[in-house]
């Protein structure tokens, strides 16, 4: 994975590659509701138009939390390294964005969503920073 990260050009691709190489492709997304943080597992990301995207169901609490306060953090771990992604997300209602997510994560998403089901919703990181940490190396910072 490290060699894949070093070869990649665009920043978002480095973040996607790291998440795609997580052992079970699970990362954790943190949101806030009032003064209470909420963390839950997620499993799909994609790059669309050079930006990092995540997906959820618009009937879930996480959807409402991100609509009210778009500041989120994600984290995942792989073989002694871990990634933290923090930033601001915004819902992208365009069908093309949902199609990109479905194409990038068909195996994970096709049993839950279709792009036109009025449930599948994608959020784009409008700004953010991903940092890959290790116990043995300096952190690698990726601007989103």
Where are these regions (language model features)?
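Conserved beta-strand in the GNAT
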Residues: 41-43
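A short, Trp-centered hydrophobic/proline-enriched beta-strand micro-motif
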Residues: 19-34, 72-74
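Extreme N-terminal tail/first-helix region
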Residues: 1-27
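Charged, gly/pro-rich active-site loop segments
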Residues: 4-7, 84-144
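General beta-strand recognition
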Residues: 28, 52-53, 73, 84, ...
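A short mixed-secondary-structure module that forms the rim of ligand-binding clefts
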Residues: 45-80
């Amino acid at each position: 994975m490290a060699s894949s990260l070093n070869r990649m050009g665009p920043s978002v691709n480095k973040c996607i590659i790291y998440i795609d190489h997580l052992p079970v492709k699970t990362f954790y997304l943190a949101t806030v509701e009032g003064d209470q943080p909420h963390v839950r597992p997620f499993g799909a990301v994609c790059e669309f138009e050079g930006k990092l995207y995540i997906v959820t169901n618009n009937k879930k609490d996480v959807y409402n939390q991100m609509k009210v306060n778009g500041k989120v953090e994600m984290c995942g771990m792989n073989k002694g390294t871990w990634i933290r992604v923090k930033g601001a997300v915004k819902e992208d209602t365009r069908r093309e964005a949902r199609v990109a997510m479905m194409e990038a994560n068909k195996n994970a998403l096709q049993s839950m969503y279709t792009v036109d089901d009025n449930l599948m919703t994608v959020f784009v990181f409008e700004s953010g920073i991903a940092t890959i940490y290790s116990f043995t190396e300096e952190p690698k910072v990726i601007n989103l």
